[in-house]
Design a protein with these regions (language model features):
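Membrane-interface amphipathic segments in extracytoplasmic regions
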Residues: 1-211
Length: 211
């Protein structure tokens, strides 16, 4: 008989069925009870690499890859809370390439899907979204991170150094860092107009993280 994972029991019943009733703001958080860490996930920002690191020596189930739920910061005062962000331009292009050019992730109709392969058309579609509450791959990073309670926000552009800082802070010594989910990367040159539109969409992200 498989024993109930106490970490998962605590996480799901407390966060999903109690805290979510009294707190409306939610985040995609991964909990590591072994290393006492909370990772606020920002998609298209080395997520698989960070996830792999947090699984280190956690065969006991002490690592929970949580879904979109509320949480109470006061319950995790002694936890290391961190996240990583990425320049909104490159993050946006990465999302478009992965979720549109490589697959029809957003389930557009066949006709609409062909149009979305044109970056200008896709940008105009994203402009119609509530950027703070839309799909997490396009959502504002500021909306994905509880900035008032962060201990550390690393940068994708300085990933190796910032990632090592997290490893040292969590005292994880036996993890060999390597980028996961890395395909062939080709530079994509945005037009001035495209760049301007992306800056408008992610104005708050640029102001807070890349001013």
């Amino acid at each position: 008989m498989k024993l109930l994972n106490p970490y998962k029991f605590k996480h799901f019943y407390l966060n999903k069925y109690f805290i979510s009733i009294i707190k409306s703001k939610t985040y995609f958080i991964s909990y590591n009870y072994k290393y006492k860490a909370l990772w606020f996930r920002t998609y298209k920002v080395a997520s698989r690499t960070i996830d792999d690191m947090l699984k280190t020596n956690c065969e006991d189930g002490s690592y929970i890859y949580g879904s979109d739920m509320a949480y109470l910061p006061n319950m995790f005062k002694d936890y290391f809370k961190f996240s990583f962000v990425r320049n909104p331009e490159s993050r946006f292009i990465s999302a478009w390439k992965d979720k549109v050019l490589r697959q029809n992730y957003f389930h557009f109709s066949n006709k609409e899907y062909e149009k979305m392969k044109d970056l200008d058309y896709f940008i105009n579609w994203v402009k119609t979204l509530d950027i703070e509450n839309c799909d997490e791959h396009l959502r504002s990073q500021l909306a994905l991170v509880d900035v008032d309670n962060m201990d550390f926000v690393g940068k994708f552009e300085n990933f190796e150094e910032d990632f090592q800082f997290v490893l040292d802070r969590l005292n994880i010594k036996d993890y060999k860092m390597e980028f996961l989910n890395q395909g062939i990367k080709k530079e994509f040159e945005l037009t001035d107009t495209q760049r301007e539109e992306i800056h408008k969409i992610y104005k708050k992200d640029f102001e807070h993280f890349y001013s």
